[in-house]
Amino acid sequence: GRGMAKAYKQAVSLFESEIKNRKVKIDINERGIIISLSNDVYFKRASSDLDIDTARTVLEKISLLLTKTELSDKQVRIEGHTDKGPTDPDGPWETNWDLAAERALNVLKYLIDFGVNPANMAAVSYGEYQPIPLLNDDTEEGMARNRRVDVLILRD
């Protein structure tokens, strides 16, 4: 409805500088509003740990959107994604599912710490199996864009 369109405009305005610097991408579609965070910007390399110095402002803005606007009663799904590259055999994640799940959970935990209602939240891992449509995942840029965590604010 119209509430989602208004909230989308608020989100675009709120994240103007991050969008300009390609740190955040915002879309709206039939599922809802998607705030896409680049893993390369917000997570330490080959890690599920958020670089909180870099991520704090963005997470605070997301929590503001999810607590202080008409989106406060919406269900939110934190979706972890990876590229199709293999995980480090010596690393802590057996598969990309594990890495994406842990990243999504870490974002969820911070948002709850920043005041988002935990009853509205869920974390999901897609591993490498939901690449961005029409994006070549064989290029370095394509792989980088697929390494992301999407904060999906669901339509009713």
Predicted regions and their residues:
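Short secondary-structure junction motifs
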Residues: N21-K23, D73-Q75, P118, N146
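Periplasmic OmpA-like peptidoglycan-binding domain that tethers envelope proteins to the cell wall
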Residues: Y42-I62, T67-T69, H81-D156
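Short acidic/polar alpha-helix capping motifs at helix-coil junctions
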Residues: N29-E30, K74-Q75, G85
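Residue-level detector of alpha-helical recognition elements and their boundaries
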Residues: I26, K74, N136-D138
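Juxtamembrane linker/hinge segments adjacent to a transmembrane helix in small membrane proteins
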Residues: G1-I34, S38-D40, K44-A46
